[in-house]
Amino acid sequence: MAVYGRILRSPRIAILVVATTLARLPFGINGLAILLFVREQTGSFAVAGLTVGALALGSAIGAPLAARLVDRRGTAMLMPLALVHAASLLAIWGLGLAGVPSIVLVGLALIGGAAFPPSGSVLRSRWPQLLGDPELVRGAYALDSSLIEISFVAGPLITAAAVAFAGPEIALGLAAVLVIAGTALFLAKLPASPAEDRHEAHRGLLGALGHRAIRTIALTTMPVGFCIGTIEVAIPAFSDAQGSAELSGVLLALWSGASGVGGLIFGIRRVRHGLVQTYLAIAVLFPLACLPLAAASAPAAMAALVMLSGLPIAPLIASRNELVAAVAPRGTQTEAFTWLVTSLVAGLAAGNAVAGAVIERDGWPAAVMVGVGAAAIGAALALSRRQTLMPSPVPAG
């Protein structure tokens, strides 16, 4: 683990890591907080679900555009985005209490999702510049993927604590404060990017997706998200079948924790293969690690199997990020990383929806198998398009 100490002792790095963690905690807070708040104010789970769906839709549509704006105009654009995002959360709070029509809350959530500042993507695009040493850069991508897992676990816990203390509106207010404070701290400590990167930004309609490697990685990321989404729903269904609804929280925490541990271990490995080979190997390993979940018959067995299936998740994300850093054209790196987040989240949403329908008809093991099948198709697609993943011999840009 010495590599992580070296990373965090590098100039500015520890503060930048803290800042991005604070800035993206709202990503884990907002969904549950908005769901609970809108449900409380309107009395309708349907309206609450529609509002959360609008938040996700706004993120899916707006995040790549926001990232392209940052690539072309510079990181100073992060703060206006953070302010719009925070304002939308506070408006949902204030107008929700005032009893405005539900469509207003849905619209505000759509705006808030679209304006979420991509500080994490910016930092991922800067690791090579900030650290230089390839060993430290590899470790930084692994550390980042593990911290993402922590954010997804901590966000709902923060919301739950806020609800227990006062109400879901407090979680919305906290999320607004965190996104502004984290973004401000991030911008204060982030060195300026090379000016030529913005001059070389692709002006085409597709932006980062104009590069074939980015298209392949985005395309093969979606089935991974789909598999994760099906398992997210299958685990609570398994717990319900065992007669212990609270078991799902423990299992999901073990799953995320194992992913974080896997990411940290991945970051200190010795490099024996190239970026493409590493990414493809973990892409193949992931569905194989998830497959045994469908055979779990008792809580202890499921606990062991969710940890097994979680181990490759953060390494897969980290290896993917390393590859993107190597192949993304100059001036499009922030957008490239954001497209991958969008692909993952889109896959998650689809996996959640499909798993619910499959569980109703065929049970939770069938949902796991559907997710594993999707991940296997994604791995096969990556293998079949491996030549598109090779860094171009001609300087990109």
Q: What does each of the following model-derived ranges do?
A:
Residues V276-A318:
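C-terminal transmembrane helical hairpin of 12-TM major facilitator-type secondary transporters
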